[in-house]
From Swiss-Prot:
Reactions it catalyzes: D-glucuronate = D-fructuronate; aldehydo-D-galacturonate = keto-D-tagaturonate
Encoding gene (name): uxaC
EC number: 5.3.1.12
Known pathway: Carbohydrate metabolism; pentose and glucuronate interconversion
Pfam families per record: UxaC (PF02614)
Entry-linked SUPFAM superfamilies: Metallo-dependent hydrolases
Single biological process term from Gene Ontology: D-galacturonate catabolic process
Molecular function per GO: glucuronate isomerase activity
Protein name: Uronate isomerase
InterPro entries: Metal_Hydrolase, Uronate_isomerase
EC category: isomerase
Protein family membership: Belongs to the metallo-dependent hydrolases superfamily. Uronate isomerase family.
Amino acid sequence: MATFMTEDFLLKNDIARTLYHKYAAPMPIYDFHCHLSPQEIADDRRFDNLGQIWLEGDHYKWRALRSAGVDESLITGKETSDYEKYMAWANTVPKTLGNPLYHWTHLELRRPFGITGTLFGPDTAESIWTQCNEKLATPAFSARGIMQQMNVRMVGTTDDPIDSLEYHRQIAADDSIDIEVAPSWRPDKVFKIELDGFVDYLGKLEAAADVSITRFDDLRQALTRRLDHFAACGCRASDHGIETLRFAPVPDDAQLDAILGKRLAGETLSELEIAQFTTAVLVWLGRQYAARGWVMQLHIGAIRNNNTRMFRLLGPDTGFDSIGDNNISWALSRLLDSMDVTNELPKTILYCLNPRDNEVLATMIGNFQGPGIAGKVQFGSGWWFNDQKDGMLRQLEQLSQMGLLSQFVGMLTDSRSFLSYTRHEYFRRILCNLLGQWAQDGEIPDDEAMLSRMVQDICFNNAQRYFTIK
């Protein structure tokens, strides 16, 4: 019987173990998409205790706590202490067997805290609390200290077009920080004209860009100014959260002006008008990214804020989102083609939340590859509900069967936690075990030089090359 979480966790044969320990584990982390706070990195935040760094803002854990029947006051309540929330988590973890949270929890205790051979639960919680808090009191366990321990080379944060990016500039000017922190352009509030807050948001964009927006070309001018600002601060990637993927042929500016005018006047838009405006903005933005050498990321298929009562109480991003089931293939094809037809499709990474769409994306990327850029259009790593063992394996296998796994840009945390870098370790172990199993079964050559190069490329090298502006 195998022992739980040894050094060879998830590595089932000697080939896999060699690939992981010798080649994957030493590679730096290129975390090109996350939701870390740039201010916390700039300020090198120090955490008061394990409960704070572990549970603050982690909606994966919050969902598990709710599923275990824990009172909301012990999850997000302002009236309860970090220790009380921590103990609620300690009582919940033994109930998470089979959920990736059980693996992640113990991986996060191993690295960076060095706690091994101990199962986390109510019986061990006090000892672990003391050990971890002692380490969190040292400089090596500040926000940047943890990133350095985990060998993080680069992170891409998620930033609104109206953001000042003051903390990115502060980080870039600080010679003591050897981790690159690049902003990523997230313009969801610009192209989602149907949202209640769209008009108010345009007012904020006007102020940030110093452009009055009454026509569609005004919007282009405002966005261009903000794109220039992001570029000056080191941005080289965009990200778009798309719940419903719409497409309609882009109308002329007169029609777009009319659509924007109706929305600014408080009138209700038709589905066609929403699709026309959304497509026009996304296609125009995509062409701007291509001209700048940026990467375009599309995260497709979440249903957000399902629980109205809890949304009113807590707001967004608090654990009440799930997988959508809209059809995406036709609209996605037309959207990408609208940029490619003029040879202005940027480097693009596609992510789906519904795993039934894996093969859709794995085959879609082959339609729009381009010369001179290996893996120009990528099928992104298992996202959100899919960044667990089964979801990662499905994505890796389907990409390998329908595309080129060797060109894959690999894993990202997509996380708000400084302890989530162990997800890169989790991914690397799964990747090495998959390749090791294929080699052991005679499906691919047992060639250490060939396999090690592929592992190192997927773990770091491909992403570093892909996100470099040439």
